[in-house]
Amino acid sequence: MKGCCFFLGLLIMCSNPGLAADAPVARRLYVANTAGESLSLIDLDRREAVSELQIGKHPHGLAVAPDHSVIYCSVESERAIKFIDTATDQVIAKVNTTGVPNQLAVTPDGRWVYIAINDSGKADVIDVRQRRVSKTLDVGPRAHNCYAPKGAKHMYATSIRDHVVKQFDFANDHALTMTVKFDAPVRPLCITQDEKWLFVALEGLHGFAWAELATGKQLGRMEQPLPPPEKRSKFAYMNTHGLELRPGDRELWVTSFIGNGLMIYDITSQPPKYVTTVAVGDAPNWLTFSPDGKFAYSANAGANSITIVDCDKRTALKDIKVGATPKRLQEVHPPRARATR
């Protein structure tokens, strides 16, 4: 009887390799621990941290190739971008940048990686095929973030000090095509897939501002009251520092860095409407979504953790400890792992 059960178990594991103990992780969250030297890797099916990838001191940004075969990490201390093979978690290439690299983004065709160079006010453009910086673009003082929505024709980069977001045509020699001016220093940004709306976090604002890209003009601000002093994060150094569009472009989620929550807005009408706030860990300063939009993940810098949130139920499901001062994070589905499912 025992032999029969063992044989049946073996058959099940062979027919479904995803059940095997050593099966590749099919859904993985990479978390950049900005005050440390590592990326934390979380198995999203098991909802637990499984390993630490040593990457270099002060990893800043993360971006993934369209096919999820490579994740790119900017490392401030080395002034470099590292290419990580997601099937093996090995660094397969390193490209030196022209200065201190901040957040980066990949063009939808996978050909180019743009990196905001904070100390020079530029954006480096890496040719992924040649693995080198092929062009450097003017952005403005304290260049900080780059962003390209899925299927878009442009890349966007921010200058904190100039209060601007610049739009570049990556298919036309990376030409500057628009500059959008805001009324305060610009932090993170996100753009709808149709490139109609641009949303930004601004210093001093507990909420967000938005612009219409057809005109290149800021349309307004949306602000939520600050929490009472006793409920504010002691770690947070600004009101918000992270925002992202839930897949489907119907909801905008904004971190309440100071209020330990994720603020949700309905953007299907103008002006956007506040919906609710989901409580997460201390000082959430970045967030991202699963590709299907079912889950949100916040990086809680004050708690050295991430929170998994059920987007439809507006409920935090689990906190998972990671490294020191987590910030950027990215869900990845390694191609080899997908092939085994």
Model-found features: residue ranges?
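Predominantly soluble domains enriched in secretory-pathway, periplasmic, or organellar proteins
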Residues: 10-341
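Bacterial N-terminal signal peptides that target proteins for export
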Residues: 1-7
